[in-house]
Amino acid sequence: MDKNKKLQSKRLRRRRHVRNKLRGSADQPRLCIQRTLKHFACQVVDDQAGKTLLSASTRDKTVRDQVKAGGNCDAAALVGKLVAEKAAEAGVKTVKLDRGHNKYHGRVKAFADAAREAGLQF
């Protein structure tokens, strides 16, 4: 099997495994993340209503001014703090972390740790 196809199949299996366990609700919405080479983004989703409650990204003006590059651990940690602050304003205290096909390592771990430190509970 080609190396890229093998990587893709592993990611798809991991995404399905994680996503089958998670369903966001109004009292405990789903915090899904998107990690690219240049940026890091997340959104808090209520799956029952089918609505996005809030979002944060390295593309936001407040984050963009503070970081040099959007695709590193420092930027992900800053997004974690920002989403925790926005969640507190919106009245969301606990969420379910949906890491998708990403391993809990590096930027994903930095994001989760920063969000926990800022008061968001997983």
From Swiss-Prot:
rRNA-binding recorded as keyword: yes
Gene Ontology MF: a single term: structural constituent of ribosome
Any coiled-coil regions, as ranges: none
Pfam families per record: Ribosomal_L18p (PF00861)
GO aspect biological process, one term: translation
Keywords of this entry: Ribonucleoprotein, Ribosomal protein, RNA-binding, rRNA-binding
Top-level taxon of origin: Bacteria
One Gene Ontology term, aspect cellular component: cytosolic large ribosomal subunit
Biased segments, Basic residues type: 1-22
CDD domains on file: Ribosomal_L18_L5e
PANTHER family associated with the record: 39S RIBOSOMAL PROTEIN L18, MITOCHONDRIAL, LARGE RIBOSOMAL SUBUNIT PROTEIN UL18M
Alphabetized HAMAP family for the sequence: Ribosomal_uL18_B
Membership in a protein family: Belongs to the universal ribosomal protein uL18 family.
Subunit structure and binding partners: Part of the 50S ribosomal subunit; part of the 5S rRNA/L5/L18/L25 subcomplex. Contacts the 5S and 23S rRNAs.
Full protein name: Large ribosomal subunit protein uL18
Gene name, Swiss-Prot/TrEMBL: rplR
